[in-house]
Amino acid sequence: MEQKENLKNLLLSYFSLFTENINELGKAKSIKHSIHTTQLPDVMPMRRTPERLRLVVKKKIEDMLRNNIIRPSTSPFACPILLVAKKEEGQMRFCVDYRPLNNVTVKDRYPIPNIQLIIDSLHGAKYFSTLDLLSGYWQIEIEEKHKYKTAFICEYGLYEFNCMPFGLCNAPSTFQREMNTLFKDVLYEFVLVYLDDIIVFSKTRDEHIRHLRIVFDLLTKENLKLKLSKCDFFKTKIKIPRTYYYS
């Protein structure tokens, strides 16, 4: 009972850190995504969206424009879009086929954590919390001079991203670099980050509250937002990214 009360008070004290609304997305203060290319990408033709899905595309475009995720473009770059079914939610995910752009992008070799290293770091911990950033990639802006390279084409026009979309080959490296830099003083001590999955781990209840407070403080200072409905607190068993379980 005391544990629940302590957690409730902690969450209330960081109320502004949490949101479920895209129009309240945070914007990382210390990093922006760059796209360095060697040449213009090959041009792929615009894909025809099935008639039954056109309203889905139209609504997604309107939502992203309204929330400043994208803007109209006059770019010479133009990658086609595609819709991918979300198995768990029964919805469609709006994606851009960035293969032409990725083929001419200079690769960022920043390392992604090894799963075994994550498992080894959790040894001895008894309490776990998993934190989910609301549309984490979108909380990192694109460098202004590189936004035109993210342009995509569809029946409703040509647009480019203001923030980092899925599908860019270097997006995982940029995001991992941001997380590792943000948590550099506590990484592997009581925080693990695998791309957009944040794990806080501790040996005692009191220690876990203290660790969560430190993490919340760092996220707040960096102007990032968590999605409360996707966060889990004080678990004794968690699913580690890429299907591994730990308890």
Task: Describe these PLM feature segments.
Residues 2-9, 26, 52-59, 76, ...:
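Generic recognition of stable, solvent-exposed alpha-helical segments in well-folded globular domains
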Residues 19, 66, 184, 220-221:
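Residues at helix-coil transition
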Residues 1-110, 189-195, 200-202, 242:
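Reverse-transcribing Pol proteins
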Residues 74-106, 131-139, 170, 197-247:
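Acidic, metal-ion-coordinating active-site neighborhood of RNase H-like domains
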Residues 67, 124-125, 189, 222:
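Structured helix-beta-strand junction loops
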Residues 16-43, 84-93, 108-110, 120-122, ...:
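Reverse-transcriptase-like RNA-dependent polymerase core
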